[in-house]
Amino acid sequence: MVAQIGARHHYAIPRMLEKGGHLQSFHTDSNAVKGLGKWLAMVPGLRASGSFKNLAQRKMVGVPGSKIKHTDALLRRRILGALHLGPGYENYIQDDHLFDAIIAARGFEGADTLYAMQKHGTKMLEAAQAAGVRTVVDVFITPMCHHIVEEERARYPGIEASCEDQARLELEDERT
């Protein structure tokens, strides 16, 4: 089982696992193959720019549609926020927490291994381990990177301003 937000590695991990006969299911957010993302990606004016252009490019070649389990919750939240019909979009960390909770709540459908990105949170990893599912975590940047950057900023003042948003750094710590 693979769980990831967006087209990380251009969907290479689920594609390779499927090719090798090892992909049980692929859990992701909105994309151009299923759900709300599929319909929005068909609208010519929306496909032309920004986030909708990125959404229209999220096509999972080599992964059968029957194995793709998606959620439109992240996209819906952003759209409602942009229309002032819900809380505004603040940052990607909220997406990570929401996706993490959704995957943890879904369960693991008999999977023996969960491959997930480090940044998506710990609820799904803890739930998988509690269910006896082996976890493989893709760490594409050290979880403490922001601390290292802040230390470098303090060491070499004047080159780049320090992060004034301590709450954001605390959120980074919380999710890692």
For the regions a language model picked out, list residue spans one by one.
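Membrane-proximal helix-turn-helix segments that form the acceptor-binding/catalytic region
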Residues: 100-111, 122-131, 143, 159-176
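Conserved acidic residues
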Residues: 24, 112-113
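Short catalytic/ligand-binding loop motif for oxyanion handling, primarily in non-cytosolic enzymes
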Residues: 9-11, 33-37, 122-125, 143-147
